[in-house]
Amino acid sequence: MVVKFTKSEALHKEALEHIVGGVNSPSRSFKAVGGGAPIAMERGKGAYFWDVDGNKYIDYLAAYGPIITGHAHPHITKAITTAAENGVLYGTPTALEVKFAKMLKEAMPALDKVRFVNSGTEAVMTTIRVARAYTGRTKIMKFAGCYHGHSDLVLVAAGSGPSTLGTPDSAGVPQSIAQEVITVPFNNVETLKEALDKWGHEVAAILVEPIVGNFGIVEPKPGFLEKVNELVHEAGALVIYDEVITAFRFMYGGAQDLLGVTPDLTALGKVIGGGLPIGAYGGKKEIMEQVAPLGPAYQAGTMAGNPASMASGIACLEVLQQEGLYEKLDELGAMLEKGILEQAAKHNIDITLNRLKGALTVYFTTNTIEDYDAAQNTDGEMFGKFFKLMLQEGVNLAPSKYEAWFLTTEHTKEDIEYTIEAVGRAFAALADNK
């Protein structure tokens, strides 16, 4: 059992003097789990982390998804080292970016053409620009609770009604920008149709997480994505899939291939970088030809397609092509799901568990979670206590009730067995303090 975080606490105190909030992304703070100093990690290997105090953890954060092959995978590490030795940035085309683009196209048939950028945020931001250029329209639709990066246009919350215009979800986002966004609930065809009937003639595109990953793991209802495509295309708008989380997470390729639904444009990130910063977007040839230098939609980047990220991404996909990896993730995910549910029943803890293959979310509620409203109405205080109990057990989770647990190819059955035992001890402690 982990008993001390002395160095993490001291480091956080020092970080607060120099870094805003002591963290470089707000999701890393412990604000959503009752506060305290976030645990500072020193190194990772395989499915494990070691913090600055020397405590070891089984890692289910996986850097919020990208680290599907585990930490410091030797094939990826070797590729990064070689790229670094050859120079990390040229500002010119390279053979690596061509090879990687071909690999992505082969894995995801909806990508006629691709363009590399530096983050998922940038990828989504640019698909919106391209969709606007192609359609000549300005408004964007999105689903409530789905996170598409931190650019102004997508930091928008729903208005007072299901088919109203949005309101800013962050200080610094002008109301004028929020007025270009319509937010509707996920998995609700009728509300989507209502919004399109009202605003469809002004909509350039709809942003879709084909499998939601930002208020936990939530799958679309049967036929929902097909209906989205039908209704949006009837309105003359484009369908953009944000596969920053989902691509290569559930199968080799995208969620669009897993679910059999094809978008017009796709945004990628996270897993495809093998742990290094990356983003990419792509889609139908006639739409992508809106992008400069062929078309009028401008997008550029000094670091875009840099050799280190290209080499890391290629190596990651090469690992993921190995036979049986995704089957292993599904098998371990099923084992973990079964064990958590058994422990919840044993200790009379109310949970709902959503899982798809090697990713899952534990919600402290008895309600079914199919949309953001349902995810919001779960017990965040109980999750915060559970999170800290699991940390004491040496199990690292994301510090938010909305985030997923991500398995990696390096987790073992022994890791899952230990985690289930740790969950049992945490649930027992929660039950004792009800």
Curated annotation (Swiss-Prot):
Gene Ontology cellular-component annotations: cytoplasm
InterPro entries: 4pyrrol_synth_GluAld_NH2Trfase (IPR004639), Aminotrans_3 (IPR005814), Aminotrans_3_PPA_site (IPR049704), PyrdxlP-dep_Trfase (IPR015424), PyrdxlP-dep_Trfase_major (IPR015421), PyrdxlP-dep_Trfase_small (IPR015422)
N6-(pyridoxal phosphate)lysine: residues carrying this PTM: 270
Pathway as given in its UniProt record: Porphyrin-containing compound metabolism; protoporphyrin-IX biosynthesis; 5-aminolevulinate from L-glutamyl-tRNA(Glu): step 2/2
An example molecular function term from Gene Ontology annotations: transaminase activity
Sorted UniProt keywords: Cytoplasm, Isomerase, Porphyrin biosynthesis, Pyridoxal phosphate
Catalytically driven reaction(s): (S)-4-amino-5-oxopentanoate = 5-aminolevulinate
Names of the cofactor(s): pyridoxal 5'-phosphate
The keyword Cytoplasm is annotated on this UniProt entry: yes
Top enzyme class: isomerase
Record-listed E.C. numbers: 5.4.3.8
Compartment annotation: Cytoplasm
Pfam families assigned: Aminotran_3 (PF00202)
CDD domains tied to this protein: OAT_like
Presence of keyword DNA-binding: no
GO biological process, one term: protoporphyrinogen IX biosynthetic process
Superkingdom, taxonomy of origin: Bacteria
Residues in coiled coil: none
UniProt-listed PROSITE patterns: AA_TRANSFER_CLASS_3 (PS00600)
PANTHER family xrefs: GLUTAMATE-1-SEMIALDEHYDE 2,1-AMINOMUTASE, GLUTAMATE-1-SEMIALDEHYDE 2,1-AMINOMUTASE 2
Assembly information from the UniProt record: Homodimer.
Family statement: Belongs to the class-III pyridoxal-phosphate-dependent aminotransferase family. HemL subfamily.
Record-given protein name: Glutamate-1-semialdehyde 2,1-aminomutase 1
Organism in which the protein naturally occurs: Bacillus anthracis (strain CDC 684 / NRRL 3495)
Lineage, top ranks: Bacteria, Bacillati, Bacillota, Bacilli, Bacillales
